[in-house]
Amino acid sequence: PIDGLLRKMVHVPGRLFSVAQWTVRNIPRLFARNERLICLFSTDAGPIVMVLVGAINVAAIETVWSGLVTPPRGKRITDFDYADTKKTYQKGEEMGRFNMGSTVILLTPPNVEWLSKFRAGQVVRVGEAIGSFTKKKNVL
């Protein structure tokens, strides 16, 4: 959503509950229980965290920098340090994909003004604007 430098990636194994609205409402802490790939970036607007959440029917999570990310044996959390690799990505550039589709959670600094047209659970397409930073006018 913004130009950034990849600092770290953490794979957290977990369940693969559906991320359909009914399931999200009825399974406590679903997004914290499902498999996740947490990607930390440094940006001009501050740190950005992109969390790719696995789900049922998601064949795999894949990133452009590491390829297919598969759960390790023993369900251990796997930490990947990219601090010294200078892996930079431009706004709008592909970061990763679900090989069936799922959910992305984006954590940003507090200086984001979200577009009012978006509602919880709404589908967002690649390249679609979702907001802007209030101090520096970068469109997310």
Please state what every model-predicted region is:
Residues P1-L140:
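Contiguous, well-folded functional domains in the mature portion of proteins
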